[in-house]
Amino acid sequence: GLVPNLLNNLGL
């Protein structure tokens, strides 16, 4: 997602 955090945004 784009909101939770940068790691999740990158798909990590």
From Swiss-Prot:
GO terms for cellular component: extracellular region. Keywords: Secreted. It comes from the Eukaryota. Expressed by the skin glands. It is found in: Secreted. This is Dynastin-3. The lineage of its organism: Eukaryota, Metazoa, Chordata, Craniata, Vertebrata.
